[in-house]
Amino acid sequence: MLSSWQGGPRPRQLLLWLLILAAWETGSGQLHYSVPEEAKHGTFVGRIAQDLGLELAELVPRLFRVASKTHGDLLEVNLQNGILFVNSRIDREELCGRSAECSVHLEVIVDRPLQVFHVEVKVRDINDNPPIFPESKKRIIVAESRPPETRFPLDGASDADIGVNSALTYRLDPNDYFTLDAQNSLEQMSSLSLVLRKTLDREEIQEHSLLLTASDGGKPELTGTVQLLITILDVNDNAPEFYQSVYKVTVLENAFNGTLVIKLNATDPDDGTNGDIVYSFRRPVSPAVVYAFTINPNNGEIRTKGKLDFEEKKLYEISVEAVDKGNIPMAGHCTLLVEVLDVNDNAPEVTITSLSLPIREDTQPSAIIALISVSDRDSGSNGQVTCTLTPHVPFKLVSTYKNYYSLVLDSALDRESVSAYELVVTARDGGSPSLWATASVSVGVADVNDNAPAFAQPEYTVFVKENNPPGCHIFTVSAQDADAQENALVSYSLVERRVGERALSSYVSVHAESGKVYALQPLDHEELELLQFQVSARDSGVPPLGSNVTLQVFVLDENDNAPALLTPGAGSAGGTVSELMPRSVGAGHVVVKVRAVDADSGYNAWLSYELQLAAVGARIPFCVGLYTGEISTTRPLDEVDAPHHRLLVLVKDHGEPALTATATVLLSLVESGQAPQASSRASAGAVGPEAALVDVNVYLIIAICAVSSLLVLTLLLYTALRCSAPPTEGVCAPGKPTLVCSSAAGSWSYSQQRRPRVCSGEGPHKTDLMAFSPSLPPCLGSAEGTGQREEDSEGLKEPRQPNPDWRYSASLRAGMHSSVHLEEAGILRAGPGGPDQQWPTVSSATPEPEAGEVSPPVGAGVNSNSWTFKYGPGNPKQSGPGELPDKFIIPGSPAIISIRQEPANSQIDKSDFITFGKKEETKKKKKKKKGNKTQEKKEKGNSTTDNSDQ
């Protein structure tokens, strides 16, 4: 008993210390995060393990877990990286309603030792709830007698969001009668009223439909609408009104009882009983009117009641009253004058004989169609009959004898306009009132083939994707023939012609009856971009008539050609290239360039390059240009970098779907001392010819400048002597200038002209030499310019064709077809206007010309101003005036001669993998270097010969 009492305080003290320690741990582990509501699953909330000071490796052994009393499934922790993320949808309005603060409280528990951390995740409100009105339509009833400034309260909208997202503003559709009075507050609407602006008129507008819109203050704002239907109640403020104040009618004396004399109609714009009208004779009423006529109080019809007698009373004057049924009735009045007419009781008779129907539409005018006779049993003026015909018809009546008429064609017929005529012959006697009789004649018009089939438009444009299945329907032509029956039966056929070396019928066919055009074989955009032909439509008339329509079928390109890597040069195998580079290079050093071409066009041939990082790792110090294919370093290399790198370059076009190709680049890192040896051997064969080429160009430029200076001095001396010399006998006149030579490089150009002088007296012929004209077009090459005869000025403006012995190098041809040059490349297309040739522009994606690769020479039919420097596929960046390109070619330079004299089996390195590092020289390049030196000597000799010719 004593021992248990002595050991009691110690466990209590231990328990107390544990509670204090747990409370201290709990307080020190409080974390706060925030996340927007409606965040997607996996949204990052915070690095909870790092913030709690826990290592990632101890999360699993220490049983790291998250618990929540009410919302345990909203947030979760990834035990691999210690990140707290959104596990399920979080709706702030569902969690906290309209509370200003909304948080999710979590408890993080770890064992060994036991630790408890409190985490508070604040849920931020987003504008995800639009304003909502209690109802989508609200009806309001307003009497038209309500005065202006009357207010009609409205129910405001509510927004489940908080703060600015729930601040509502209202707007009403513009109108002339109502305006909106709204007092805004940040949280809710205090009052919302509809105010009447001016007096209403139900007779003008019976119902107003307005749209009330509520907008919250979120970004972007959300809106809610309610349609206000305002019905105007009627007030009896309008009296019935007749259309006329006085009506005049006539009635025959032999009219039967109940004969309608007139139907009076009064209108009241009021509604309901206020607009119901009762008709009556206005008092006092004469006994004669009461005896002869009666009035219907509901519809205003006045009918005969007793027998009328023209000899006893010829005219009745009746006063009629119209009264509405409003609480305070209002009345309208009019006067009716009824005239009684004498009777002509015998009508004429009409007889039609000798019809010639139907008639052809090509019948000539004045042809007789029918004979008509009329008669009337009355005598005097009541028996005198006149005939008339339906107006506005191509027929007329011609009186041939007393009471006899002929129906004659008056003008040309057109069955396509009117196929039949319903003629009405009216015979009227001379009685008072006159009696008449009518007879109908149906005249049919027979068709004549006078209309050719007509298409809706003279030309149709059709777009067909390439690789279509054979026999697919691409278009339907339809021609309409205004004729009838066989004359309108249309058949279709192709207008045969040759398309290249093949007949048109081998490409397309047309169905004779339906006009459907079919493609007989798959079309290829790369071979045929436009197919233009004609379809003929003919009717079945005698003789047949026809017309043609032109179809322009454009073959649309599809992405059916994958990018193709250009064949690598020596030292490469397949799509793989090896390269040595020193470790001492800095960031941005270009190592190698990958090139590819795509046979498609447009976006289908626009190529982009990217490294496949998954194959080589994510920390390589290299990157590739998206559109250039240049592989360069991203940072300086250090010792920890691997000595060998294998890069996979993915070449992808922009078609749908995109097609790809893969190139492999093997890079080996060497020390700085080893790089120059490999570099000197690798660049000896490639740089040497280019350096020699630049030296020769410099010499040529110096020589040309010296010769030009000498010519200028000679010209000045000649002019001075000419001016000081006495005039020669005879008359001399300048002849037409002849262009000797003109050349351009970049924005600099020079030219020469000869102007022979034609003299009529004694003295030698002289020639004026004009040099360095900056605005003349280029002439032909030096071999053709010296022996050319004098031409007219018009001949100088004609474009020159390129020399047949000039051609592009392999790299330049590849650049012309690369992704960057798709729109700038010169492509020969056989279009409607004939083939035209464009030369490619120089872009940043094309490297500077290597040995044996030059720009097109001046005089080869190319305007040097069209060679512009471009940076990527965007807008061209033109060189400024007075700027010279880094390298340009002078006509007759060794570069051109080397190209013209290059043998067919030349093994000059034209690798399309252009490397900028330094690699070892192979045995083939050593042999090639010796051959190039011999070739350069020959080219220098040829260059001297060409310069002397110029």
Curated annotation (Swiss-Prot):
Residues 1-29 form the signal peptide. It is a single-pass type I membrane protein. Glycans are attached at residues 257, 265, 548. PXXP repeats lie at residues 734-737, 774-777, 799-802, 832-835, 873-876, 891-894. Keywords: Calcium, Cell adhesion, Cell membrane, Glycoprotein, Membrane, Repeat, Signal, Transmembrane, Transmembrane helix. One of its GO terms (cellular component) is plasma membrane. GO terms for biological process: cell adhesion; homophilic cell adhesion via plasma membrane adhesion molecules; nervous system development. Residues 787-800, 909-923 have a biased composition (Basic and acidic residues). GO terms for molecular function: calcium ion binding. SMART domains: CA. It is found in: Cell membrane. Residues 30-697 are extracellular. Residues 34-133, 134-242, 243-350, 351-455, 456-565, 581-678 form the Cadherin domain. Residues 719-950 are cytoplasmic. Its main location: membrane. Residues 734-894 are annotated as: 6 X 4 AA repeats of P-X-X-P. It comes from the Eukaryota. Residues 774-808, 827-950 are annotated as: Disordered. The chain crosses the membrane at residues 698-718. It holds the Pfam family Cadherin_tail. Potential calcium-dependent cell-adhesion protein. May be involved in the establishment and maintenance of specific neuronal connections in the brain. This is Protocadherin alpha-13.
